[in-house]
C-alpha cells in the first residue's frame, strides 16, 4: 500500500497509464488481425492496404515503448513476407 503522498500519486498515475497502454495494445492486436484476415482471404491488394495502416500503428506504439521496437520490426517483417508469398502463390 502506498504510504506517502508521492507513492499514492504514482499509484494513481500507474493505473491510468496501464489502462491507456492496454487500449493501445488492443488497437495494435486488431490492426495485425485485420492484415492476417486479408492474407487468409488471399486478397493481396487489400492485404497491402491494411498492412500500410498496421505499420503506422506498430511504429507509433513502438515509439511510445508500449511494445519493444524489435517486436514491432519482427511483426512487420513477418506480415510483409506473408503478403509477398501471396503473389508467388
Swiss-Prot record:
One of its GO terms (molecular function) is small ribosomal subunit rRNA binding. InterPro entries: Ribosomal_bS20, Ribosomal_bS20_sf. Pfam families: Ribosomal_S20p. Residues 1-26 are annotated as: Disordered. GO terms for cellular component: cytosol; small ribosomal subunit. GO terms for biological process: translation. Keywords: Ribonucleoprotein, Ribosomal protein, RNA-binding, rRNA-binding. The keyword Ribosomal protein applies. Belongs to the bacterial ribosomal protein bS20 family. Binds directly to 16S ribosomal RNA. This is Small ribosomal subunit protein bS20. It comes from Dechloromonas aromatica (strain RCB). The gene is rpsT.
Amino acid at each position: 500500500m502506498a504510504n506517502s503522498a508521492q507513492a499514492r500519486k504514482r499509484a494513481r498515475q500507474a493505473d491510468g497509464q496501464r489502462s491507456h497502454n492496454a487500449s493501445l495494445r488492443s488497437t495494435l492486436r486488431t490492426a495485425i488481425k485485420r492484415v492476417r484476415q486479408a492474407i487468409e482471404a488471399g486478397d493481396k491488394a487489400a492485404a497491402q492496404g491494411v498492412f500500410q495502416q498496421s505499420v503506422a500503428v506498430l511504429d507509433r506504439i513502438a515509439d511510445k515503448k508500449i511494445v519493444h521496437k524489435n517486436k514491432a520490426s519482427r511483426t512487420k517483417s513477418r506480415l510483409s513476407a506473408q503478403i509477398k508469398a501471396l503473389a508467388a502463390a
